[in-house]
A protein has these predicted regions:
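Anion (oxyanion) recognition and catalysis
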Residues: 11, 73, 190, 241, ...
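N-terminal glycine-rich flavin-associated loop
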Residues: 1-17, 35, 40-87, 99-132, ...
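Helix N-cap motif at beta-to-alpha junctions
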Residues: 1, 178-181, 222-229, 282-286, ...
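Structural motif
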Residues: 15-18, 36-38, 55-57, 78-80, ...
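Short glycine-biased active-site loop of nucleotidyltransferases that positions the nucleotide triphosphate
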Residues: 27-33, 209-212
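Conserved glycine-rich FAD pyrophosphate-binding loop
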Residues: 15, 22, 29-36, 41-42, ...
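C-terminal substrate-binding/cap subdomain adjacent to the FAD-binding core in PCMH-type
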Residues: 96, 115-269
Length: 377
């Protein structure tokens, strides 16, 4: 209610608001314009309801992702997302940026797991959409609309997610070698009956920097009962062996450290001048893209990934390649002067006018995160 009052005052005063959680993703998106007030949801940090038997969780927007996972672990459950900087990321920020990684291979994206939201409209009114049950049919599906909208449509205060049981055993197979063989291995795994939790293609520089081998990489994780994990890992290694790839298995602490370090290598650049980008291409073009990239990874099924560059010229070259392959490249984090010079979002598709109409409907005075989204929305 206090947050609603603040936004209502801002609406009447025509103050421009930049909503955030812990601020871990404020560098993402376009540069917001003429901000008057920054509103943080850090103190909205309560777990409201954990329905253990129903596998649902309702939390306030400022709860940290790591705190949620620690609470759920006591009941052998998980929220099946893997955002960047999980120790800092809040639920509101994860929804606003649609931030999850390769767990989408098995569990889907943020919007696929979001069941309901409570939010404050631009005029300060509190509203709700969805519910607290998995089979929810009430109202419009605003959850999908708000996911990835970068705080331009509302300020989320509460969210309800579906949960999943924690699996008893986990194991990872890593294949490295030539781009042709890695491409064939990815095609084989995509077309098989294997059920990986995570499966990513890695650039040669990323493979080398982590000491995982030489050439491009394919990393595949399975989580299930021990027998299933062992059998599926063996099948991946057999695929690699037939193609002349080097195969290694990881378990326990070694595996956990591997999956923790992987996103850190990309999202924690050594130089402030480096540029981090989100890309999407057709899965069959992923190896071609990674072969020309410096540091990066791409999910084998969705074709979504993260790349890091040292200069803007290479960003534009990669954007052209992605768009030629029916994809996109948008800049997440970069020096201010780079974002002032380049179009952060790139090709906006054919829905820009529709998006502007939605923005006008939800925020007619343009006070929420102005200019941060695609097309200056």
């Amino acid at each position: 209610e206090q947050l609603a009052e603040v936004i209502a005052v801002a609406y009447r005063s025509k103050w421009r608001i930049l909503p955030c959680g812990n601020g871990s993703k404020l560098k993402w998106g376009s540069l917001s314009k003429h901000i008057d007030v920054v509103v943080s949801t850090q103190r909205l940090n309560k777990i409201i309801n954990h329905a253990v038997g129903d596998l649902t969780l309702t939390v306030e927007a400022g709860v940290k992702f790591a705190d949620i996972q620690a609470t759920l672990a006591k009941h052998n459950q998980i929220l099946a997302l893997n955002p960047t900087t999980p120790d800092l990321a809040t639920i509101g920020g994860i929804i606003a940026t649609g931030d999850t990684g390769s767990l989408r291979q098995r569990y889907g994206s943020v919007r696929d797991q979001l069941l309901g939201v409570t939010f404050v409209r631009a005029d300060g009114q509190i509203a709700r959409a969805g519910g607290r049950v998995v089979k929810n049919v009430a109202g419009y599906d605003l959850m999908k609309l708000f996911t990835g909208s970068y705080g331009t449509l509302s300020v989320i205060t509460e969210a309800t997610f579906r949960l999943y049981p924690m699996q008893s055993t986990s194991g990872t197979a890593m294949l490295t070698g030539s781009k042709e063989a890695i491409s064939q291995a990815a095609d084989t795994i995509r077309g098989s009956a294997l059920t990986p939790t995570q499966a990513d293609l890695l650039s040669a520089q990323l493979v080398s920097s982590m000491g995982l081998g030489k050439g491009l990489g394919l990393i595949v994780r399975f989580e299930s009962i021990p027998e299933s994990v062992k059998e599926q890992l063996n099948q991946v290694l057999q695929v690699g062996e037939k193609l002349g790839l080097t195969g290694v298995q990881y378990f326990d602490t070694e595996e956990q450290n591997l999956w923790r370090l992987l996103p850190e290598q990309i999202h924690l650049p050594e130089q402030e001048s480096e540029i981090t980008c989100k890309i999407g291409v057709l899965p069959n073009a992923a190896v071609e893209v990674l072969d020309r990239a410096e540091l990066g990874l791409i999910n084998i099924s969705s074709g979504l990934g993260i790349l890091r560059f040292e200069d803007e010229k290479k960003v534009l070259e990669m954007r052209n390649l992605c768009e030629l392959r029916s994809g996109f490249l948008s800049i997440l984090s970069a020096p201010i002067e780079v974002k002032q010079k380049l179009d952060v979002w790139g090709y906006s598709g054919n829905g820009l006018e529709l998006m502007r109409g939605i923005k006008k409907q939800f925020d007619s005075e343009n006070i929420l995160s102005p200019g941060r989204f695609v097309g200056g929305i």
